[in-house]
Amino acid sequence: MATGGDAEEEQVVPNEEDEADVRAVQARYLRSPSPSQYSVVSEAETESIFMEPIHLSSAVAAKQIINEELKPRGLRTDTECPGMLESAEQLLVEDLYNRVREKMDDRSLFNTPCVLDLQRALTQDRQEAPRNEVDEVWPNVFIAEKSVAVNKGRLKRLGITHILNAAHGTGVYTGSEFYTGLEIQYLGVEVDDFPEVDISQHFRKAAEFLDEALLTYRGKVLVSSEMGISRSAVLVVAYLMIFHSMAILEALMTVRRKRAIYPNDGFLKQLRELNEKLMEEREEEDGEEESEEDAGSMLGARVNSLMVEEEDDATSHLSGSSLGKASQVSKPVTLIDDEEEEKKLYEEWRKGQGFPKGEAAQGRKGRSCSMSSAQDGDDCEDEDVERIIQEWQSRNERYQAKGREQWNREEEEEEENSYSSRRRRHTLSESSASESVSSHDIRILKQQLERSTQSRRGRYRSDSESSESTWDMWNERLVEIEKEAARKYRSKSKREELDGDCSEAGGRVREDDEESVLSEASSFYNFCSRNKDKLTPLERWKIKRIQFGFHKKDSEAGDGGSEHGTEEAAAGEKNLSDVNLTAYQAWKLKHQKKVGSENKEEVVEMSKGEDTVLAKKRQRRLELLERSRQTLEESQSMGSWEADSSTASRSIPLSAFSSAAPSVSADGDTASVLSTQSHRSHASNMPATPLPNLPVGPGDTISIASIQNWIANVVNETLAQKQNEMLLLSRPPSVASMKAAPAACGLGGDDQLSVLSTSLSGCLPPPSQGRPSSDVQSVLSSTSSLTSRAEGSGNKVRGTSKPIYSLFADNVDLKELGRKEKEMQMELQEKMSEYKMEKLASDNKRSSLFKKKKAKDDEDMSVGDRDEDTDSAIGSFRYSSRSNSQKPETDASSSLAISDHYRNGRSMGNEMDSNINTWLSGLRMEEKSPPQSDWSGSSRGRYTRSSLLRETESKSCSYKFSKSRSQEQDTSFHEANGDTVRNTSRFSSSTTKEAREMHKFSRSTFSETSSSREESPEPYFFRRTPEPSDGEESPEPRRPNWTRPRDWEDVEESSKSDFAEFGAKRKFTQSFMRSEEEGEKERTENREEGRFASGRQSQYRRSTNQQEEEEMDDEAIIAAWRKRQEETRTKLQRRRED
């Protein structure tokens, strides 16, 4: 292999053998025959086919090999002078210069920026990359990179409906098949991101696709490319340039504000060419429009010269113009040919300028020139239009002054003329009158008509002509117009008054709005001419609406309306100078005057607007007071149930739950619902919040302060009651009953409800009044309702109380109420089984079994009975208090009965009090061996049903009382509890009328019931009786009450069974007589005896300390009860068959 020697040494051309060696070296260094650490596919097992990056050492070796071993380039013999050749540096500089020159080439007919300027604007001193993968660069147009275009989930979230792929097949390899199932329309543009690529061929197609996408319902289009900075951005910019008439820089910056884009030089150059093309097209369109306008101005110039020539012959000019105008008045004025429009506009301008003869002659020369030039060409037409505009600009101020003077002069002439000429001046049929009458008045009239109609047409023309670019001048002119119209108004209204009596059907009074605009017609026309290229059609429309918004109403009302209506309006409006009207009233008057339907009386009424407002205020105040009075009367009627309670409904209102039901706790410590529904014994004891006395007369006014004070009192009492209930809820039930009991011990029958309220209010000390509990009772009444008083007979119960504060009843929880009602019904059902067992025991009380056991069990039962009595009382009462119906539990009903008994017989109440005190002192002794005197009517009621039940059922006690003793009980209780029937029925009446009537049993039954009840240790917030002293004796915590589902019929039946079936010495015959009276209700009770008897038996056996032999007695009782049950069922079946 040849090696290189000195620089001057002659190089030897290698032979073929050496050349092969060189190639071998090249293959070694320039190709990697096997994978190497530099190979792109170094992990591949196959031989690399790629050119590898050459390592530095390999590069040095290769260079040395090439320099030494390969044949050098032969020296060319230069035919040219070496100085004439360009060096590489020169070539590079030239190439750079050419590129920069292309980028800086800003040669353009439309000042299109060069590519370099566009790039500088896009980079903004630094080149940025897009921050987001996708950006919304135009409403519903998104530019995104490749990752977004292939993410179907993201496309769905974006709501994309169209996709324009600017790199279809050249970077973003998607297609319409890729988006199947997404309901996406796809368009792919196959373009590489190189400057030499021609993307302009896709501009139109892509722009049309984008436009179609945005026109679809909820259309959103995604334009994607590899990076979303060049190809996709160029297509969006082309769309903005084509369909939104944006210049190239504006379109690029619109996109750049939303996303960093950087199209390559070639794309920018093609966008620049597109901009030039679009600008050229738009210029051609504008040129066509201008040529059309020039043709119109040529026609206008022709008409101008003709009109000036006709001015010499005033009669022919006036008649012709008035004929033309009269015919045009009846036409629709919005659509007019170009020739007619130009003619009218110029005539309007001429009339507004009021040229003198010299000016007319001077104009005639110029316009005759323009007439001849119209045949030759369009040279003089532009000059004519410009001259018209310049004349208007130079004379606008002078014209305004002249217009005012001309107005005044015409007014004076009109006033001087006769009535007939005045009338003709306002008619629409001047075309016929102009030929027959050629007076000066007619000429003036025709000029005015022309001016008015032309001004109106000039207004219509303003829709198609451009208007001024600012609003200020028009606002000033409007103010001046209004002032002039106001000045004209009074003299015109006087004239119309004179003409009013003789008005004709065809007559027409020109309205002040018309007159106010007459002088402005030429001004408006010239504004249109001067500024026609400065405003958009929308702005022109706004100008028209502001300046001439009444044009249609004017033409319709003015043409069709007679003088009579307008004169009437004027006569009515005569009053308006002295009237201070609101903006709305002024507008209404103007509107009525336009349509010719003004109402004098309405105007006069408007002048009395202040009185009307006062009357409305007074009426509103009266309505408010009447509403308040009705509300208060309803509240009073709620509180005055005594007057008509016999006819009142016996059902408990749902609103009665509202005040206390939500506050009842799970263990039923409070009887707030019972207190809510508590039936007051005497309405006089109800110190409810007094209602304000209100006069009834419709003209009267009531003091709002009194109503507010009353409402404040109501709220305060309600809040106090709620606080008391919360306090009571936090105490155990035994404490509540213990506190309630002593307070109730010494109270009379009328104060029993106050005991209940005392317990509810947390044992508040009774204030010193005639009755110590009257104020507590008022607290109760404030939360609850005014309760009804029972009438003399047992069946008549005045209806349930209706809460006076029903406005606080919005918080009723119906679900909670339903749940509590179900619990109460379950309690009643289980209670029924207990009652049936008690009945069974009473039926068999004369048996030797009971007699044998009674003496021994009395002592054992005394303590247990009290406990169980307390439990039963609280359990029964808990549920009855929770739900609105006061369930006829024995204890509650007995206490109620005694309260009624006291209410109706005060002496017996006093006797009861003394008996209770005596009984309290020696309760245990009495319970161990109750003497017969203790069983007198007042003290007999101390045994609760539950105690009797346990005596008879749980302990299998055979009663020691003889028949005479039981009869004694009955008779004595007849004496003491004459009202018991009433009480019992009254208690049950809180639930239903039927229950109330069912509770009328024989007095003996009731005496037993109430006597047994009197002993019940109910918590005193439950009892309405004075005997709650039992609660003192049974402070043990009450056992959880039994939940017993039962129907409302069960409630009634239970109330019946409560009173009929349990007594210290109850005879089954008595209860059976009552069951015969009640029929099917008794049947239901008997049916349920079997259902719950065994469960209740075991429960009561467990609750008392019994001896083993009692179990045998229980079995005997059960056998006897089953036998009794069978007999009862057979009897009931017999009765049913009968």
Swiss-Prot record:
Chief localization: cytoplasm
Pfam family, one: DSPc
Localisation: Cytoplasm, Myofibril, Sarcomere
Record's keyword terms, sorted: Cytoplasm, Phosphoprotein
SUPFAM superfamilies for this protein: (Phosphotyrosine protein) phosphatases II
Stretches with biased composition (Acidic residues): 376-385, 858-871, 1107-1116
Start-end of Low complexity biased regions: 773-788, 936-947
InterPro entries: Atypical_DUSP_subfamA, Dual-sp_phosphatase_cat-dom, Prot-tyrosine_phosphatase-like, Tyr_Pase_dom, TYR_PHOSPHATASE_DUAL_dom
Every Tyrosine-protein phosphatase domain range: 132-280
Residues annotated with Phosphothreonine modification: T427
Compositional bias per record (Polar residues), positions renumbered to this chain: 316-331, 672-687, 878-897, 980-992, 1095-1106
SMART domains listed in its UniProt record: DSPc
MF term (GO), any: protein tyrosine/serine/threonine phosphatase activity
Biased composition (Basic and acidic residues): 386-409, 552-567, 595-614, 965-977, 1035-1059, 1074-1091
Region of interest called Disordered, as start-end residue ranges on this chain: 1-20, 309-336, 348-473, 486-515, 552-575, 592-618, 660-694, 761-800, 850-1117
Gene Ontology cellular component list: sarcomere
Sequence positions bearing Phosphoserine: S291, S373, S503, S555, S862, S929, S966, S1016
Domain of life: Eukaryota
Similarity comment: family membership: Belongs to the protein-tyrosine phosphatase family. Non-receptor class dual specificity subfamily.
Function: May be required for myofiber maturation.
Protein name as catalogued: Serine/threonine/tyrosine-interacting-like protein 2
Species assigned in the record: Mus musculus (Mouse)
Taxonomic classification: Eukaryota, Metazoa, Chordata, Craniata, Vertebrata
